[in-house]
Regions:
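Bacterial Sec-dependent N-terminal signal peptides
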Residues: 1-22, 370
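Solvent-exposed N-terminal domain segments of exported/luminal and surface proteins
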Residues: 21-171
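A short, polar beta-strand/turn micro-motif
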Residues: 62, 68-115, 119-122, 188-242, ...
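Extracellular/lumenal glycan-associated surfaces
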Residues: 123-125, 178-191, 316-332
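Core of folded catalytic or high-affinity ligand/protein-binding domains
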Residues: 132, 137, 145-207, 226-227, ...
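Extended, compositionally biased non-globular segments
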Residues: 227-229, 234-353
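Low-complexity, Pro/Thr/Ser/Gly/Ala-rich linker/spacer regions in secreted
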Residues: 360-376
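C-terminal outer-membrane/trafficking sorting elements
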Residues: 371-382, 386-457
Length: 457
């Protein structure tokens, strides 16, 4: 079966890349065409600070075999603060990613994911796997390792899950920095947009993150893994052939039924013990608390051991292997989160210091505009009637800036905002406005669309 899938995969990708200018691995990147720079919060100040370095992707170039993505590693959405004491702040990392046009399935020994960058999101931000470099040290009955606990080294048997253990240190967009390398370990949607909100960070430090989960449509490509295969958001077609409707793609990993940590799910042999399961170290605190239950033909919406599957997607109508950013029914991140614990393909994406072959620069036109999207379906304005705040949410990533104006019944403009490229949310504070009817107008190069809103403070 794997041979058949591999051959189909190769055919589909070759078909999709025969015209390189329309290949998703070239056209999916969020290029900075407006000069937008990064922004960040510091603790105690909910007004974003403008940074000097550019956000998103600066250029996309391609050759016969590779795509080169140049980026700072900084998104256009506001990042920070990190309330667990993390002293770092994201900065310009001057990355050039070299990605194969045709990724290759690994038919030999699988490559495990590692610490550090294991993929790149479409805005140039790094993807990390579950880990934070901390593990249990049995001889001292304590956690060791990671950037904040050197030079202590753990046993490397019970490895801490950053998504669980470092939640207090994630910003509203579910990211944080390692030195200047801002990154996500998990589905990059904002905490306050989850169906069950498990962090209050967005209350003071709002950010829209990379994309908004929409359960009614197939999620977009949100990145590429270090084996060159695409990463999608949380939702896809139920069946691999594109049938069955839109469903949440589910992880095939589940928590083990254990109270002591002295074995791994792959064997009954005793290993160096970790701490007993407790409120301090609950199930899920360590990666080894999970077990993999293989999916079957009866559960096509459950993913394989790499957190992906071969399937049809909107961008790959002939099919491709792809990963999904998994969430649970409450839209909270679900292990193994994006990619892992091993890659499906040959790990062949790299960072390079320069481009040493002849390339073509991709200059594809922006596609997300008032001319190309149905605003009534793609824009959500809430709450309406509004008290304190009006949120404008786009279900698609904006590929260029829009202007937004709020005016009263006499036509007087009472507030203006920029809806930035790469954003999905823009908002107005309304506490200083009189109650009544207003019009919210979105403007794109002279084309306007207005919505009626009610303010009732």
């Amino acid at each position: 079966m794997k041979t058949k899938i591999t051959s189909l995969l190769g055919a589909s990708i070759i078909a999709s890349t025969s015209l390189a200018q329309v290949s998703p691995v070239i056209s999916s990147w969020l290029r900075n065409t407006t000069g937008i720079t990064g922004r960040h919060y510091v603790s105690g100040n909910s007004t974003p600070i403008n940074d000097s370095y550019l956000a998103n992707v600066q250029s996309v170039k391609y050759s016969t075999n590779f795509v080169y993505v140049s980026c700072t590693g900084i998104p256009s959405y506001v990042i920070g603060p990190y309330l667990d004491g993390n002293p770092n702040q994201g900065g310009n990392n001057s990355n050039i990613y070299k990605i194969p046009l045709v990724p290759v399935a690994n038919t030999g020994s699988l490559s495990p994911t590692t610490g550090g960058t294991i993929g790149v999101f479409i805005n140039g931000v790094s993807l990390f796997d579950y880990r934070d470099g901390v593990s249990w040290k049995s001889s001292t009955s304590s956690l060791c390792g990671g950037p904040i606990m050197p030079p202590c080294t753990g046993d490397g048997v019970w490895n801490r899950d950053a998504v669980v253990a470092e939640r207090a240190g994630f910003d509203c967009a579910k990211g944080h920095p390692a030195m200047t390398n801002y990154h996500h370990h998990q589905n990059p949607s904002a905490f306050n947009l989850d169906l069950t909100v498990i962090s209050s960070i967005c209350n003071l430090y709002a950010s829209d993150a990379l994309y908004v989960i929409n359960s009614s449509v197939h999620s977009p490509i949100i990145g590429y893994a270090y084996d060159g295969f695409p990463i999608y958001g949380a939702y896809g077609y139920k069946n691999a052939d594109g049938s069955g409707g839109i469903v949440r793609m589910k992880s095939s990993f589940s928590l083990r039924s254990i109270t002591t940590r002295n074995t791994l799910y792959t064997s009954t042999a005793t290993v160096t013990p970790g701490p007993a399961v407790s409120t301090t170290y609950p199930l899920g605190y360590f990666k080894e608390d999970y077990q993999y239950v293989p999916t079957t033909t009866l559960t096509p919406d459950y993913l394989d051991i790499h957190n992906g599957r071969f399937c049809v997607t909107p961008e790959y109508p002939l099919g491709t292997y792809c990963y999904f950013a998994t969430v649970d029914a409450n839209h909270n991140s679900a292990y193994p989160y994006v990619v892992g614990p091993t890659f499906y393909g040959v790990k062949n994406v790299s960072k390079v210091t320069s481009i040493t072959e002849t390339t073509t620069t991709y200059t594809g036109s922006a596609t997300t505009s008032l001319q190309t999207i149905n605003l009534d379906a793609a824009i959500n304005i809430y709450p309406n009637p509004s008290a304190d705040l009006i949120m404008i949410q786009s279900k698609e990533l904006l590929s260029h800036d829009l202007k937004v104006e709020l005016s009263n019944l006499t036509g007087q403009i009472v507030a203006k905002k920029d809806f930035y490229q790469g954003s999905t949310i823009c908002y107005f504070e309304t506490t200083g406005l009189y109650n009544g009817t207003y019009f919210l107008t979105i403007i794109d190069n002279g084309i306007k669309k207005s919505f009626k809103v009610i303010i009732n403070n």
